[in-house]
Amino acid sequence: MLTDYSVLISESYDGQHKLLTEELKRNGTKVHICGDTEIELEIGAVKYTPDVIVIDCCKLGYKKLLHFREILHEDDIHPIIYNIYTYDDTETIRILLDYDDILHILMPYDAKNVCHYMLDKLKRIPVDPDILRQNIS
């Protein structure tokens, strides 16, 4: 399955980002890597014009993430965040989960499922989010 989609992944995306990168490339998606600061993400968004940006919400920070989300929303870029449950504040988690345009990845995850979830979301195909809860054994 070849796609015309482009994904930007923050380089702080620990461990499994290589599996996700391989799976996305296998499906014909262009994958770019950038730094994990707000300015590096903004530069990557302008330089590569991705359809999706994968972000560690804890590295970027809650307030910067919400500000960055507004910038991405204007450019029709879909943010995908992970490590959301490492926040101690349940109110912060609740607020982040309430945004419909932010996709969430639970850790650990199956790279193949996340890849297909991302591509289906880009194609506007309804997907059961429970697929992301399947852990690698």
Regions found by a protein language model. Name each.
Residues 63-77:
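Short amphipathic alpha-helix used as the core "switch/output" element in two-component signaling
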Residues 125-137:
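CheY-like receiver
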